[in-house]
């Protein structure tokens, strides 16, 4: 046996290499899947951050147990949770109130302790040691005049409902603290400072007070409703794929067994996030490698078949010497299976090395390298498939009669086995059809191109030889010798069919893999662009809408492309968010695809310019002629204004009475010395239900500090007359402004300057409204604003599939305040480079605007790339490269095993009188045609397979409604991948043809040497 292997070293090496590739695919899949799982865990833990990943246990004191302290809670921590946690941080806390200064209302405050807190504070004074001692923040000390020795009182609850009211707890200040900003793993988002002086909107805007830090002794005999808290920071080094699920399970059990204990769900949320990715990894990675393994087994079968064909004479000789069919089978299979077995260890080592390389290129650094036990069944399966492939390759030869074995080529070799081909085509076709119709779905759809390519390749291998023979006969009639020889060669040589099948499958895998990777990347980038809106989104700290607009204008003046944006989040999660933008600059800064199709011109401000009030004193002549029914005071004419800071102001300028008609001269101070915008005019009426007032009010010569106001122009005012007849119609003539009013039930009526559209036009997405509908949305001030739907769109930048887009400049003219509790004030930047962002910060700082964190599209895209789907699909590129390598190996093996027969045929042709040019051209054409046809068919299979497979492949761990996935082929990538495969395989085919031609000798026609 060993002598036979040495005699055909090339074949033995080829069998061993292909067997190694089968084993490589089998071992690499579970090893790399495990690595992706490790990376998912790392990403989830790192992205969560210490404060989100920590588990908090909180137990409140009750009437029956009013002395709970942190050690009791710490004793409940299960071992599995403690195993993945750092040292616990414990403490007591009680939400109460304190009077910061005499005469002020009580402010809410938290009295608390924390493990080793004084080691994490900078204290002027000393740390609390006795009951009732506290340290206060430096901000509170400065704001309220607190200092060492200051005494404060905080109330406490009754221990029992009918117990007497307990005395307040007296606290003594013994120090002033500052909390450094560089210890996030200690505070875990629960910092004691940052609240001082901030108004509390839930409690009459009383100023906030930072936490009061005390010692645990303060809680021993006081505060019967306080809570004992234990926080367990996650230890990233201890959190593994095995330990973290155990910790999550233990946490769930702890909460079920202790209903009074509040248990954080951070461990469970991390496990759920990792598990979602693992579900995808467990399917995507194996299927990517399984289709490559299928090709490897197919190649092994073809290589073994070629090796068997070369041993036909040896099998015949063994049979003639008295060996039975079984004995001949044993000799042949032993010689062929031995290289296959020798290739398995090489495949294991190759898989591990490949995993190391791919991990370093795709996954985060410093991941633990593990070889899971799941490798064993995969390796065993690879061994069985490899041996089965060799057996099936040898079986037809072993069943042939001795007479047929004495021939170099089997009588049916040119046609192949119709039964085998039919079975392969039917099975592969059914698989591809099942995926196309949805009967088979999921990530297993990755196998669609391979199954389709196998079916097409086998059919083509059946049809192409007949077409080649037909072409050869036609070429012969036309005297085209080279084409005739090439056609007959393709028609009669089994190697041509084998090359065609392998090339088709390899090309399909390579082109599909490249296309799938790029299509997935494009969709991830599209989602990141939609969710961020612009290349860079910078948070800014402003309290007024004009400030936000001025900040963007300042950036624009300095050459920084920027657009102001405010995103307003409603209180209810079911309501649509509002995004207020500058329609003039958004299109220049936002990602083009996110604003494509948005009619931003519809949001543009009207042609009417704002009317500025150039002074303080308003003068005019006012006449009225009114009819009133019911009781009530005389109506009042008021001027509505907006201050430069965006605040709304109203000043009464005339009383329209006491008579039903009359005239008066006004000379009133508007109290707007900084210059205001004229927003509108209103008539305030009074009266009981059923009362009515109507008539006209005429204003002539309206001036401010002697300067006429341009209020009588055409289309300056907006009529507010409703369908019920109430409201104001405005008419102008000369310097006269006539208001035709109608009001009922004592309601006020008003008219507006037309510099702001009312209702505000809006672009809506998934709001349950139709084009032209009017409804209310939350505006930048946290109030309700009427909007009219100008158009419905599928998606909006930043708010994605559910939101309303309105004009920020329009809102700024009527709404100055920003509701900071619900509004994200942002500057969108076109330049996301570090230099561009730093330049924007410098300009904003010069304008007195504080800038905050910056979110970039690149970062958002990177988050999606660092997912099971992202990493798993990138593996398709590796599979495509290996597939082309396998196809090249088949070309080499078939050339090595068949060159003697080819040289003998060519030598016979030369002796018969054919020229060298015709012979060499025929051989090159024979080699190139099979490869070229396989490449074209494989590309077609890849495109059809993409249409079938891509809709079933998860592009994201968490799917989104928008943007709608664009699964159309990435044509440039398809062309590049096809060209790359063609360049490699066609060039290799030419090289092999040249190598065979160089071995051409005329004496080879006498017979093949053995």
Residue ranges and their predicted role:
Residues 348-374, 437-444, 936-979, 990-1003:
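Short helix-loop junctions at transmembrane helix boundaries
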Residues 440-610:
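Juxtamembrane segments of multi-pass membrane proteins
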């Amino acid at each position: 046996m060993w002598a036979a292997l040495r005699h055909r070293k090339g074949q033995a090496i080829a069998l061993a290499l292909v067997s190694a590739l089968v084993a490589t695919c089998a071992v690499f899949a579970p090893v790399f899947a495990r690595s992706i799982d490790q990376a998912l865990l790392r990403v989830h833990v790192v992205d969560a951050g210490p404060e989100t990943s920590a588990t908090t246990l909180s137990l409140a004191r009750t009437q029956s147990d009013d002395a709970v302290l942190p050690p009791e809670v710490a004793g409940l921590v299960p071992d599995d949770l403690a195993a993945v946690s750092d040292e616990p941080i414990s403490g007591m806390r009680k939400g109460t109130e304190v009077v910061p200064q005499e005469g002020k209302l009580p402010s809410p405050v938290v009295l608390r302790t924390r493990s080793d807190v004084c080691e994490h504070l900078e204290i002027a004074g000393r740390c609390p040691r006795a009951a009732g001692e506290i340290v206060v923040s430096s901000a509170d000390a400065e704001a309220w005049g607190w200092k060492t020795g200051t005494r404060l009182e905080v109330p406490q609850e009754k221990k029992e409902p009918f117990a007497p009211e307990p005395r307040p707890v007296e606290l003594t200040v013994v120090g002033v603290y500052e909390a450094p900003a560089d210890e996030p793993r200690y505070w875990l988002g629960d910092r004691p400072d940052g609240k001082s002086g901030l108004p509390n909107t839930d409690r009459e805007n009383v100023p906030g007070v930072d936490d009061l830090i005390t010692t645990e002794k303060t809680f021993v005999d006081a505060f019967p409703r306080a809570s004992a808290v234990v926080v367990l920071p996650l230890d990233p080094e201890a959190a593994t794929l095995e330990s973290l699920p155990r910790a999550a399970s233990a946490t769930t059990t702890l909460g079920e067994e202790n209903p009074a204990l509040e248990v954080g769900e951070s461990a469970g949320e991390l496990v759920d996030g990792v598990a979602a990715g693992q579900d995808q990894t467990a399917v995507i990675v194996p299927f990517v490698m399984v289709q490559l393994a299928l090709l490897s087994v197919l190649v092994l079968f073809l290589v073994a078949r070629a090796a068997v064909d070369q041993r036909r004479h040896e099998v015949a000789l063994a049979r003639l010497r008295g060996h039975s069919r079984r004995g001949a089978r044993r000799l042949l299979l032993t010689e062929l299976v031995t290289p296959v077995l020798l290739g398995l260890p090489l495949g294991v080592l190759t898989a591990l090395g490949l995993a190391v390389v791919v991990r370093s290129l795709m996954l985060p650094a410093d991941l633990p390298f593990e070889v899971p036990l799941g490798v064993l069944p995969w390796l065993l399966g690879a061994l069985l498939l490899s041996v089965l492939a060799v057996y099936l390759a040898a079986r037809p030869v072993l069943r042939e009669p001795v007479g047929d074995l004495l021939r170099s080529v089997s009588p049916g070799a040119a046609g192949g086995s119709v039964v085998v081909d039919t079975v392969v085509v039917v099975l592969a076709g059914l698989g591809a059809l099942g995926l196309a119709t949805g009967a088979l779905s999921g990530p297993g759809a990755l196998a669609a191109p391979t199954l389709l390519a196998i079916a097409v390749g086998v059919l083509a291998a059946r049809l192409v030889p007949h077409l080649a023979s037909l072409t050869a006969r036609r070429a012969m009639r036309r005297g085209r010798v080279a084409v005739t020889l090439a056609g007959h060669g393709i028609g009669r040589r089994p190697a041509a069919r084998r090359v065609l099948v392998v090339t088709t499958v390899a090309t399909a895998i390579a082109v599909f893999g490249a296309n799938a990777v790029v299509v997935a990347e494009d969709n991830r980038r599209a989602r990141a662009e939609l969710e961020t809106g612009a290349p860079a989104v910078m948070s800014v700290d402003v309290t007024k809408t004009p400030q936000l607009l001025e900040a963007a204008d300042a950036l624009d003046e300095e050459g920084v492309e920027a657009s102001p944006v405010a995103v307003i989040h409603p209180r209810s999660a079911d309501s649509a968010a509002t995004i207020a933008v500058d329609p003039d600059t958004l299109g220049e800064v936002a990602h083009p695809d996110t604003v494509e199709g948005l009619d931003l011109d519809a949001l543009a401000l009207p042609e009417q310019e704002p009317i500025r009030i150039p002074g303080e004193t308003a003068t005019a002549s006012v006449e009225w002629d009114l009819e009133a029914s019911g009781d009530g005071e005389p109506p009042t004419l008021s001027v509505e204004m907006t201050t430069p800071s965006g605040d709304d102001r109203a000043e009464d300028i005339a009383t329209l009475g006491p008579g039903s008609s009359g005239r008066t001269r006004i000379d009133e101070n508007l109290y707007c010395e900084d210059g205001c915008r004229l927003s509108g005019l209103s008539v305030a009426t009074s009266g009981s239900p059923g009362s009515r007032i109507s008539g006209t009010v005429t204003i002539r010569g309206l001036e401010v500090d002697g300067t006429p106001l341009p209020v009588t122009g055409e289309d300056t005012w907006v009529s507010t007359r409703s369908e019920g007849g109430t409201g104001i119609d405005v008419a102008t003539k000369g310097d006269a402004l006539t208001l035709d009013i109608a009001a009922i039930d004592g309601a006020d009526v008003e008219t507006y300057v037309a510099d702001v559209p009312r209702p505000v036009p809006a672009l809506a997405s998934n709001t349950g409204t139709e084009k032209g509908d009017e409804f209310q949305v939350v505006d930048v001030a946290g109030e309700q604003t009427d909007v009219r739907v100008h158009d419905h769109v599928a998606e909006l930048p930043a708010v994605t599939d559910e939101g309303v887009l309105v004009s920020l400049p329009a809102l700024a003219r009527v709404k100055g305040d920003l509701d900071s509790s619900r509004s994200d004030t942002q500057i969108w930047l076109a330049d996301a480079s570090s230099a561009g962002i730093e330049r924007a910060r410098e300009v904003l700082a010069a304008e007195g605007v504080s800038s905050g964190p910056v979110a970039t599209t690149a970062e958002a895209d990177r988050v999606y790339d660092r997912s099971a789907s992202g990493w798993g699909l990138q593996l398709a590129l590796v599979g495509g490269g290996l597939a082309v390598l396998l196809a090249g190996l088949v070309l080499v093996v078939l050339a090595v095993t068949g060159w003697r027969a080819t040289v003998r045929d060519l030598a016979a042709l030369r002796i018969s009188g054919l020229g060298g040019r015709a012979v060499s051209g025929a051989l090159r054409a024979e080699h190139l045609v099979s490869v070229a046809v396989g490449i074209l068919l494989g590309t077609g299979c890849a495109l059809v397979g993409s249409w079938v497979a891509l809709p079933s492949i998860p592009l994201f761990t968490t799917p989104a409604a928008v943007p709608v996935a664009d699964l159309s082929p990435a044509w440039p990538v398809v062309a590049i991948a096809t060209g790359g495969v063609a360049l490699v395989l066609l060039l290799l085919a030419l090289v092999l043809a040249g190598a065979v031609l160089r071995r051409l000798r005329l004496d080879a026609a006498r017979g093949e040497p053995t």
